[in-house]
């Protein structure tokens, strides 16, 4: 997840955007920072159900129990949303991820109010899947 801002910086950058067009562009730019997944990682086991777009998230325990996350999507805005979620969860252990609620951060960014219902549902599906995978790893 190199290149993603820390939570507080993400929020500051998001709130500096003058309008929602700028915020969408920032989200897409964050998605471009994610390393692409190998074809071998695009398996049903890593696919997130409940997203209209195709979404894959790979989670592995790293150094000191910190969970390493990698993800991709076939849609630019969704890939950006993956990056936003990863930025909020970065440097956390599996138990930290299970205990951490990202939704207040989305509210501070007014994110869910400006997403289509299907994207909001997909975002919730991503969060549920990440927390479930983290619970399995803890």
From Swiss-Prot:
<protein>
    <recommendedName>
        <fullName>Cysteine desulfuration protein SufE</fullName>
    </recommendedName>
</protein>
<comment type="function">
    <text>Participates in cysteine desulfuration mediated by SufS. Cysteine desulfuration mobilizes sulfur from L-cysteine to yield L-alanine and constitutes an essential step in sulfur metabolism for biosynthesis of a variety of sulfur-containing biomolecules. Functions as a sulfur acceptor for SufS, by mediating the direct transfer of the sulfur atom from the S-sulfanylcysteine of SufS, an intermediate product of cysteine desulfuration process.</text>
</comment>
<dbReference type="GO" id="GO:0006790">
    <property type="term" value="P:sulfur compound metabolic process"/>
</dbReference>
<comment type="subunit">
    <text>Homodimer. Interacts with SufS.</text>
</comment>
<dbReference type="InterPro" id="IPR003808">
    <property type="entry name" value="Fe-S_metab-assoc_dom"/>
</dbReference>
<dbReference type="GO" id="GO:0005737">
    <property type="term" value="C:cytoplasm"/>
</dbReference>
<comment type="similarity">
    <text>Belongs to the SufE family.</text>
</comment>
<keyword id="KW-0963">Cytoplasm</keyword>
<dbReference type="Pfam" id="PF02657">
    <property type="entry name" value="SufE"/>
</dbReference>
<dbReference type="InterPro" id="IPR023939">
    <property type="entry name" value="Cysteine_desulfuration_SufE"/>
</dbReference>
<comment type="pathway">
    <text>Cofactor biosynthesis; iron-sulfur cluster biosynthesis.</text>
</comment>
<dbReference type="GO" id="GO:0016226">
    <property type="term" value="P:iron-sulfur cluster assembly"/>
</dbReference>
<feature type="active site" description="Cysteine persulfide intermediate">
    <location>
        <position position="51"/>
    </location>
</feature>
């Amino acid at each position: 997840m190199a290149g993603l801002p820390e939570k507080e910086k993400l929020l500051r950058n998001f709130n500096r955007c003058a309008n929602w067009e700028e915020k969408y562009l920032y989200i897409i730019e964050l998605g471009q920072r994610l390393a692409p997944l190998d074809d071998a990682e695009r398996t049903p086991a890593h696919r997130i159900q409940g997203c209209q777009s195709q979404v894959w998230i790979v989670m592995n325990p790293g150094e000191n129990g910190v969970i390493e996350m990698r993800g991709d999507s076939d849609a630019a805005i969704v890939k950006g949303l993956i990056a936003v979620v990863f930025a909020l969860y970065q440097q956390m252990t599996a138990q930290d991820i299970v205990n951490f609620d990202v939704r207040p951060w989305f509210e501070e960014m007014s994110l869910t109010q400006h997403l289509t219902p299907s994207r909001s549902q997909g975002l919730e599906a991503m969060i549920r899947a990440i927390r479930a995978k983290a619970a399995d790893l803890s």
